[in-house]
């Protein structure tokens, strides 16, 4: 196949359309996410898609599943519980690194060599979900990790790896 011309797909599948539409944005509408959109976003990020085995939408190295997804809003921060598909309150106050209706913080244990890779996989799920549903996001490494670690009540080697402000396009 060396030297053969490759053809661009016709974007007939939902996945191909999401890939075509994926872009980063840092400007968001002030419109809040609906509960359904927030629920779907969390599930797409790292939810359980095979209840019989507990396996997730995002693969992870050696199936460690150590990425924790925190949801930060203007009112407070919550930990996503994939087993129950619920948000558990962590703290009050606004700690969003970039002002969007919601900011997802991807946390892993730095004692694992795989945390950054696993965070990247979850990040891609978030980006593709947003592109496929017409929502806006940008994966970011820039954040005050020490302040987030304190606000999210992280322990030991847990640290924020990436954050995803999410909202609707402005």
Label each PLM-derived region with a short phrase.
Residues 61, 139-140, 156:
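Short, surface-exposed helix-loop/turn micro-motifs enriched in polar/charged residues
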Residues 46, 74-76, 109-111, 143, ...:
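Solvent-exposed coil/turn segments that connect beta secondary-structure elements
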Residues 153-170:
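A glycine-rich helix N-cap at a beta->alpha junction
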Residues 101-102, 161:
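Conserved acidic residues
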Residues 1-100:
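N-terminal amphipathic, basic helical "cap/leader" segment at the start of enzyme domains
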Residues 17, 26, 31, 85-88, ...:
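Flexible, active-site-adjacent loop/turn segments at secondary-structure boundaries
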Residues 22, 41, 69, 102-104, ...:
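Small-aliphatic-rich amphipathic alpha-helix that forms the alpha element of a beta-alpha
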